[in-house]
Swiss-Prot record:
Belongs to the RuBisCO large chain family. Type I subfamily. The gene is cbbL. It comes from Hydrogenophilus thermoluteolus (Pseudomonas hydrogenothermophila). Its cofactor is Mg(2+). HAMAP family: RuBisCO_L_type1. Mg(2+) binds at residues 195, 197-198. Binds 1 Mg(2+) ion per subunit. The record marks 328 as: Transition state stabilizer. This is Ribulose bisphosphate carboxylase large chain. The basic functional RuBisCO is composed of a large chain homodimer in a 'head-to-tail' conformation. In form I RuBisCO this homodimer is arranged in a barrel-like tetramer with the small subunits forming a tetrameric 'cap' on each end of the 'barrel'. The lineage of its organism: Bacteria, Pseudomonadati, Pseudomonadota, Hydrogenophilia, Hydrogenophilales.
């Protein structure tokens, strides 16, 4: 006698289950927008549904265990499709995920689904996560920045202007003593911070403990001479979590105010763990985004940096590198302005002109300082102040240490240029348009600035941006 049929076995099209164009997203849903280039001959609705399925509940065939759960509740839903301006191959797919799919406070769990195996799925030729809407209920379960912008300003007693920093160069090869000397010269010249570069860990030429001690000596000497709070981002990145904590504890023990982590190479869970430690121990946390361009630069495959910025705000950093627009590194101006808003503001409205697809409510979560770093010098100062505003960190590496008169002179030139631009802005002047006049006037009483302007007057990085906003192709 044949057994009664309990379910329909076999393979069926994803769109039968995961394409719901009538679905109205809930406030509690995670929303994602993917840029999809489907395989030839695969309909858009099928590709969108396949991404929704593979990033939520589905496997490649119907399984009887679907009957043991509420598949209708737990599945991801592709609910809308849009054309990508200027790209006939690609389209946007909007997908909603129910709150029950994810562990509270675990960014790792959320993105293991959203950008996990689905990115190797054969049904699509390329796939890019362009934006996500993090529901407020999930935001409130995440730690966020250890301290945030306002607490950091109070700790440093610095207000009304961007903070000024410098990455020590050469990034590799200096002894700890010479490295500390470079830190001291920069700080006494007028900078607020100096910084380890991302790949300065504990190499044979300079072990981490020696570097920390010489840098802290430089900080204390510069503070005593200038009367200002100073700091150096001591990179605690290491091969194990135990080693990271060991370095962080030592930095705290010697009295440094801020440490640094390379959050993509050490991982999100490690960064969130260190962020919690920083909050508990009163340490500021500077976050470097080394490796981000591997993930976000290809305009058709990967993860847009605005998503990485949201992730970092959730897991918790006080500073995050954001690009410069005007320097040597990739950065579309409109997109960068959108990233800055997402790092700092409590509520960000959807704005396609800045690449922001969804409203984002951060509740009471503190904001992060966006960090402009990479190929910038005094001539860029008017644009940087205009783009980034006061709540930012402007870091000039070669643009400080490359000064013909040395580090202290380079730091002095940048500090004078910064204060001249802030003063002009506060007086209502259009500082980007009048930048040359503002800097030239300031240089009359600052020979260090005059020499810096002469040194870098011809230096430009005129390369086209690879990852442009799609709206610019219209």
């Amino acid at each position: 006698m044949s057994q009664p049929k309990r379910y329909e076995a076999g393979v069926k099209e994803y769109r039968e289950t995961y394409w719901e164009p009538t679905y109205v997203p809930k406030d509690s849903d995670f929303l994602a927008v993917f840029k999809i280039v489907p395989q030839p001959g695969v309909p858009r609705e099928e590709s969108a549904a396949a991404v929704a399925a593979e990033s939520s509940t589905a496997t490649w065939t119907t399984v009887w265990t679907d009957l043991l759960t509420d598949l209708y509740y737990y599945k991801g839903r592709a609910y809308a499709i849009e054309d990508v301006p200027g790209d006939d191959e690609a389209f946007y797919a909007f997908i909603a995920y129910p709150m029950g799919l994810f562990e509270e406070g675990s960014v790792v769990n959320v993105f293991t689904s959203l950008v996990g195996n689905v990115f190797g799925f054969k049904a699509v030729r390329s796939l890019r996560l362009e934006d996500v809407r993090i529901p407020l209920w999930f935001v409130t379960t995440c730690p966020g920045p250890p301290h945030g912008i306002y607490v950091e300003r109070d700790k440093l007693n610095k207000y009304g202007r961007p903070l000024l920093g410098c990455t020590i160069k050469p990034k590799l090869g200096l002894s700890a003593k010479n490295y500390g000397r470079a830190v001291y010269e920069c700080l006494r010249g007028g900078l607020d911070f100096t910084k380890d570069d991302e790949n300065v860990n504990s190499q044979p030429f300079m072990r981490w403990r020696d570097r920390f001690l010489f840098c802290q000596e430089a900080i204390e000497k510069a503070q005593a001479e200038t009367g200002e709070r100073k700091g150096h981002y001591m990179n605690v990145t290491g091969p194990t979590m135990e080693e990271i904590y060991k370095r962080a504890e030592f930095a705290k023990e010697i009295g440094t105010p801020i440490i640094m982590i390379d959050y993509l190479t050490v991982g999100w869970a490690a960064t969130q763990s260190l962020s919690k430690w920083c909050r508990d121990n009163g340490m500021l946390l500077h976050v470097h985004r080394a490796m981000h361009a591997v993930i976000d630069r290809n305009p058709k495959h990967g993860i847009n940096f605005r998503v990485l910025a949201k992730i970092m705000r959730l897991i918790g950093g006080d500073h995050l590198h954001s690009g410069t627009v005007v320097g040597k590194l990739e950065g579309d101006r409109a997109a960068t302005l959108g990233w800055i808003d997402l790092m700092r503001d409590r509520y960000v409205k959807a704005d396609r002109s800045r690449g922001i697809f969804f409203d984002q409510d951060w509740g009471q979560m503190p904001g992060m300082f966006p960090v402009a770093s990479g190929g910038i010098h005094v001539w860029h100062m008017p644009a940087l102040v205009s783009i980034f505003g006061d709540d930012s960190v402007l870091q000039f590496g070669g643009g400080t240490i490359g000064h013909p008169w040395g580090n202290a002179a380079g730091a002095c030139a940048n500090r004078v240029a910064l204060e001249a631009c802030v003063k002009a802005r506060n007086e209502g002047l259009p500082i980007e348009k009048m930048g040359r006049e503002i800097l030239t006037e300031a240089a009359k009483s600052c020979p260090e600035l005059k020499v810096a302007m002469e040194t870098w007057k011809e230096v430009k990085f005129d390369f086209d941006t690879v990852d442009k906003l799609d709206v610019q192709h219209r």
